[in-house]
């Protein structure tokens, strides 16, 4: 269920929306073609911020105001190079992507970020399907 919920965060992001998963001292979110801007924080040293490319390729990735900074980087879903970063005490931070979808995890004591996008998104998530799946295995009780 955890992975499916992360997939849902990416789906929301790809439609110009944002969601936050809270649990076990961490928050997970996603951003597509946009940025997360965190206000000044007071996060304990050693609490991790991690950024992963949900897209096959994410272009123009930037991380500023963190222990390790990058600018205009290309990230892929098959190479882990955005893990175990940290907020700087008292500093604002920025995580952005020009094109692609990033999954971002950060400590729950960090302020929730302001979210911005580079363009508007069209469409919605579609209609709600309430039918029982045809993939459901049906076992009838056998009489004895």
Description of each model-found segment:
Residues 24-26, 30-143:
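Long, charged alpha-helical interface segments
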């Amino acid at each position: 269920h955890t992975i499916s919920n992360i997939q849902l965060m990416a789906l929301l992001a790809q439609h110009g929306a944002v969601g936050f998963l809270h649990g076990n001292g961490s928050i997970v979110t996603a951003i597509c073609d946009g940025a997360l801007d965190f206000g000044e924080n007071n996060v304990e040293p050693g609490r991790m911020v991690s950024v992963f490319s949900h897209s096959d390729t994410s272009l123009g990735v930037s991380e500023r105001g963190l222990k390790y900074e990058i600018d205009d980087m290309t990230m892929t879903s098959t190479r882990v190079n955005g893990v175990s970063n940290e907020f700087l005490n008292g500093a604002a931070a920025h995580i952005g992507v020009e094109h692609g979808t990033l999954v971002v995890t950060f400590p729950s004591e960090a302020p929730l970020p302001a979210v911005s996008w580079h363009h508007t998104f069209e469409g919605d998530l579609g209609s709600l399907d309430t039918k029982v799946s045809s993939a459901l295995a049906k076992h009838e009780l056998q009489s004895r």
